[in-house]
Amino acid sequence: MNDDDFGFSGIIKIANVSDFIAPSQACILPLQSKESDVEVQIRVRSRAKKVDDSAVKKVEVTLKDCLACSGCITSAETILIKEQSKPKFLEGLKKAQLSVMTVSPQSIASIAYKRGCHLSEAARLIARIFMNMGMKYVVDSSFGRLLTLSLSYDEFKESQLQRPIFTGVCPGFVCYAEKTHGTLLIPHISCVRSPQAMMGALVKDYLARKFNVRPEEIFHASVMPCFDKKLEAARSHSENHFNCREVDCVLSTGEVDAILDECSSTESFPVDGKVGWLNALENGKIISSEGGSSGGYAEYIVKRFVEESKTPLKLKRTIKDKNWEIIEAVDGETIVLSVAKCYGFRNIQNQVQKLKRSKCNYDYVEIMACPSGCINGGGQIRSASIEERKQLLDTIELPCSEDNSEMEEQLERVKEEWSILNPDWMNLLYTKYHAVVKSDADRISTNW
């Protein structure tokens, strides 16, 4: 199995020379053994006794072990296959009392492009297939994104985070920051959780309390454009408030597309009253995204800042390419606020170097590990050639013109009810980051 089979972000695969090595080959994680006071005598034998392989217990390194280890930037593909795969998905779906699937709009867009259908048709297809398989709800991850955007702006205005503030929604960037530039980058990373994590909290806490179901009896799967989201779901903070993960299984767009190819469904589900966040996708409604295909975080921050400003401000855009854009709120010739969209490892490295020299002068940076952002995630459906892939990126679009006011009103009602069900609900919406201390072995390999 080679790297091309699993599309981790480039920032994860090339940031460390010891990266992307299967644990069975060269894992530096020390194996635990009990200490003993028994003295051992060593003597030379002419012939070694044959070891009984059947009596030796197999050593297993879990995904969580890899994330806690300083030897690699990320875990091995074999571990991800074992813990985040179709068999794991089917197993969890079969055992659950309540099952929910969260689907990203980028995944819907990729599937729609491949099948030559409208986004709403693709949304209905995905919902029908998985509801036929046993899913109770198939929901749009953008409902969680609305919460992430709102809290990100509150944090931007009120927090004491060092400027610039970097978004913390890309697990590839977060993993890179913690393991290579922890002291430098962590004080700048937003503590607001990603849309996938927000949906995890909604499902495992809000819905669990609302429907009187224990969190461990709920199976929550997600469909994401990025394999790095499998890493995010395995992070230990997703289990801090529960006895189980908030997201039990993450499937890539390509993995879900393969499932769709194996299934067929002509059954339609009738609309039960008003379309809401729990049944929007099955009715072909996708929450729109203004400001690009990666969540629109920079756009949201600067536009809301302008709306709330007591002084009339204008927006000035500088677009260098698809991976680098600067948006400034200006009052005449004065720059009042400066935000940026930064995609791809090369641009991230440039910002790290500027930060080291205290020359990163932006207030807020929407930062993603993948070139072209989330729409180009490694888990998306791949084209046969580079030319087709470029055409795909130019063609795939997310809904951006529809009014989200109805969904935003629903979110406010959910927040109000959630606060009654769990007075500490806000604690579930933020996270913390930890710099991983490198071992001596890793320092040697890094400086090799």
From Swiss-Prot:
Keywords: 4Fe-4S, Iron, Iron-sulfur, Metal-binding. One of its GO terms (biological process) is iron-sulfur cluster assembly. GO terms for molecular function: 4 iron, 4 sulfur cluster binding; metal ion binding. [4Fe-4S] cluster 2 binds at C170, C226, C370, C374. The keyword Iron applies. Signal peptide: none annotated. SUPFAM superfamilies: Fe-only hydrogenase (SSF53920). PANTHER family: NITRATE, FORMATE, IRON DEHYDROGENASE (PTHR11615). Belongs to the NARF family. This is Probable cytosolic Fe-S cluster assembly factor Bm6838. It comes from Brugia malayi.
